[in-house]
Amino acid sequence: MSPESRKLLNIVILGVGFMFMFTAFQTSGNVAQTVISSLNSTSFHGSGYTSLAIIYSVFSASNLIAPSVIAVLGCQMSMFLSGLLYSAYIAMFIQPYTWSFYTLSVLIGIAAAVLWTAQGCCLTINSDERTIGRHSGIFWALLQFSMLFGNLYIYLAWKGEINISDTDRRTVFIALTVISLVGSVLFFLIRTPDSDSAQEDEASDSVADAEGSMSAQGCLSKAMDAFRKSLKLSITKEMLLLSILVAYTGLELTFYSGVYGTCIGSMNVFGTDAKSLIGLSGIFVGLGEVLGGGLFGLLGKNNYFGRNPVVILGVVVHFLAFYMIYLYMPSDAPIASRSGTDLSAFINPSKTLALACSFLLGLGDSCYNTQMLSILGSLYPDNSAPAFAVFKFVQSVSAAVAFFYSNYLLLHWQLLILVIFGFFGTISFFFVEWGLTQRSLYNSM
């Protein structure tokens, strides 16, 4: 197998592993608040929004140490151990207790930081300037198939259900736990690519497992060096500009993965289908993600226009979705009580309109995330782990803030925040992309 084919295979395995893990985790996140509201146990007093806020708060702080962990453990072991904690969090829903719910929310925040930083490192090591766009799209498309499978089951199993029974909850989360474990094991199939340059020789050190006779002092030195690189990289001009758009991706991640599905489920106008529509909404978000990731993956190798047109498509698609959501969804939908909301907005809601907005949210998200993965890999090929750690740090901080305010803000205020960050984040991305293009032209002269 040629070196390029081996790298492509690694990307496919990486994407499939994440697909299994996040089939379980994203489905859990989409239905967490609904499941918790339906719990019969009087001893459980958790909040899905609060749990997600804890996850992303810890996630953001843990990104500062994630490169150090990866420098010591290597990418494969880091992703595997993180996957085990993801599985433990999902398994907790089989028989939830308030203490285990919030404890595992903290642990999975740490695991997420290590997992996503290792993913960015693995993606960069298996790519170059010519293939980074294609590989980012392929990985993103495979990852977002996770939005389809779990949510399809939720839709079929919970169709017509108003409250989720203990039996249904246990059945779903046992299956999701097994699926998550399968994804974790797949990471061991990734092989370190053959190095064809000094740059890859250096980068491959962060992918190989930390085996052999590395001393404790050597581990500490390696960890501290990775930490210092993260701090230095976080204050570069390019990273500061990109941070605005990165913050937006965190805000809209919260919206489509946690808030929007809950809003649909709280609308009494949808009747007995409201709960099953949560799963169907997740499916349509996934369809948009897969379409975008697949399309940009195919175009990535032959994209002569750069990343800006894709980001423009993302902002147009998202703003259209926000406008339609504002028109049809009642303002109290995100904070409605267990009995739901009977309020109306400006136009009559319909299932078709709700699912169309779900699709647009997914398509727009794929536009932003594929291009962020691509531009970070191009800007920081020698410092991929610190770069992706900073990316995930900013994204998770904004996601945590969004999960906190989702408990209190009416829908129209949440949409306004998204529009403001989306607009200015897109402008900042343009400046970084133009600077990178000029640098590439200068180096080619």
From Swiss-Prot:
Belongs to the unc-93 family. It is a multi-pass membrane protein. It is found in: Membrane. This is UNC93-like protein MFSD11. Keywords: Glycoprotein, Membrane, Transmembrane, Transmembrane helix. The chain crosses the membrane at residues 8-28, 52-72, 74-94, 98-118, 138-158, 170-190, 239-259, 277-297, 309-329, 343-363, 385-405, 415-435. Glycans are attached at residues 40, 163. GO terms for cellular component: membrane. CDD domains: MFS_MFSD11.
